[in-house]
């Protein structure tokens, strides 16, 4: 069984437990009470190369990365460093995240928030909105085409934005067929967990104008941001480098690089 398949099995089991605990009707009522979502697409379009900083305790490829006892404090550091948006892992078994982390971060910061998880059900989309998310990750490799389209439509019906993640040409084609407006190109191979930054450079030219492109994985510092920007990135997502170093300074350095004229070469 692949790493992705194992993760999805756990996600479905945990989802079933939450559905028993909190009925969908209750979630929908909570959605009606939360403030309207932030317009993340406008934030990305009005920025130079945007930085999405991630609250990430662990990963299947690296194991434990950081304890992160106070995700709100980490998010405040990210916001102070200039992050355009913050990604919050909510998958618990492999990434050590939770919806409580999303709640804590939402209370602390004003920038758009991405719920980063393995979304397979509309229930999770309503969860994301109920807990304050403005964006929701959809991983093409985890979904068949009807489910991908349906979830993207549900996300947008609640005023949020879908970040549709791809890893190869076929997945990019599916994302575009699903009318994705925000596409994340992940340089990490889901089968081997290895990072190949050339993946972004290969796929980005196939993304049509008007679709915002996010480079995911392999962002260690400003040189990586500039390389991704030269290949056409509108934004980068940074996780490991931010949580294992000085979070505020790491983000600030990336933001400064993204604002540099050199970052506009490929855009």
Swiss-Prot record:
The question of whether Cell cycle is a record keyword is answered with no
GO terms in the biological process aspect are: L-tryptophan biosynthetic process
Q: In which pathway does it act?
A: Amino-acid biosynthesis; L-tryptophan biosynthesis; L-tryptophan from chorismate: step 4/5
Query: PROSITE patterns, per this entry?
Result: IGPS
Q: Does the keyword Amino-acid biosynthesis apply?
A: yes
Entry-linked InterPro entries: Aldolase_TIM, Indole-3-glycerol_P_synth, Indole-3-glycerol_P_synth_dom, Indole-3-GlycerolPSynthase_CS, RibuloseP-bd_barrel
EC number per UniProt: 4.1.1.48
Q: Which GO terms describe its molecular function?
A: indole-3-glycerol-phosphate synthase activity; phosphoribosylanthranilate isomerase activity
Renumbered to this chain, the signal peptide range is none
User: What reaction does this catalyse?
Assistant: 1-(2-carboxyphenylamino)-1-deoxy-D-ribulose 5-phosphate + H(+) = (1S,2R)-1-C-(indol-3-yl)glycerol 3-phosphate + CO2 + H2O
Keyword annotations for this protein?
Amino-acid biosynthesis, Aromatic amino acid biosynthesis, Decarboxylase, Lyase, Tryptophan biosynthesis
Which Pfam family, any one of them, does this sequence belong to? IGPS
Family matches, as NCBIfam families: PRK00278.1-1, PRK00278.2-4
User: What is stated as this protein's family in its record?
Assistant: Belongs to the TrpC family.
Name of the protein this chain belongs to? Indole-3-glycerol phosphate synthase
Q: Identify the species of origin.
A: Frankia alni (strain DSM 45986 / CECT 9034 / ACN14a)
This chain is encoded by the gene named trpC
